[in-house]
From Swiss-Prot:
Quaternary structure (record): Homodimer. Interacts with FtsZ.
Alphabetical list of HAMAP family matching this protein: SepF (MF_01197)
Organism encoding this protein: Prochlorococcus marinus (strain MIT 9313)
Protein task: Cell division protein that is part of the divisome complex and is recruited early to the Z-ring. Probably stimulates Z-ring formation, perhaps through the cross-linking of FtsZ protofilaments. Its function overlaps with FtsA.
Pfam families recorded: SepF (PF04472)
UniProt record similarity statement: Belongs to the SepF family.
Protein name from the UniProt record: Cell division protein SepF
Recorded GO CC terms: cytoplasm
Signal sequence region: none
């Protein structure tokens, strides 16, 4: 069939377009008769849905569309205490938070600039999962996922800077600088730039 005759058929409203689809007609009568004869020959037993269906209806599928989240079904909460020595260990803290575990970071073993970087990194990950963060002590921080509620009853006492008098003659000023505890970025702005 040529293109012009097809266009004429479309314009004229011919639904079958000169029997182009007749070639695709299935010969179902012969197949149905053969299947019907084989069923009667085998004693007329009924086929089960799994025998006649090409798809596995059961196959271990329980019919539930619920996808489990790690840590949600467990009854006990888990707290990870981490004492990292380098920034390279911080992705483990983020992974623990993603698994809905609380993380306590003790950063006393790290250099102050690396500790500040680590606190900011984990604080960003905690913010991304809508978690909570709290400074527990000097260079010790608590990071919790959103499923954990963190409350601090002595927030005023914990956030107020404590003044410790030191004898400046006995301790060189350079060692005071390196032993300084990191202050997270979210507390530096609220505490007046400690």
């Amino acid at each position: 069939m040529s293109l012009i005759s097809r266009l004429r058929a479309v314009v004229a409203g011919d639904d079958y377009l000169d029997s182009d689809y007749d070639d695709l007609d299935y010969d179902t009568d012969d197949h149905m008769d053969a299947d019907h004869r084989s069923d009667h020959a085998s004693g007329g037993a009924l086929a089960t849905p799994s025998d006649s269906s090409p798809f596995d209806l059961g196959g271990g599928f329980s019919g539930s569309n619920v996808i489990g989240m790690p840590g949600v079904g467990s009854t006990s909460a888990e707290v990870n205490l981490m004492e990292p020595r380098s920034f390279d260990e911080m992705p483990r803290a983020i992974q623990a938070l993603r698994e809905r575990k609380t993380v306590i970071l003790n950063l006393t073993m790290m250099e102050p600039d690396q500790a500040q970087r680590a606190v900011d990194f984990v604080a960003g990950g905690t913010f991304a999962i809508d978690g909570h963060q709290e400074r527990v002590g000097e260079s010790i921080f608590l990071f919790a996922p959103s499923c954990v509620t963190v409350s601090n009853t002595s927030y005023d006492e914990a956030s107020a800077p404590s003044m410790v008098s030191q004898d400046h003659d006995s301790v060189p000023s350079s060692s005071q600088q390196t032993g300084a505890a990191p202050v997270p970025a979210w507390e530096a702005t609220s505490a007046g730039g400690l």
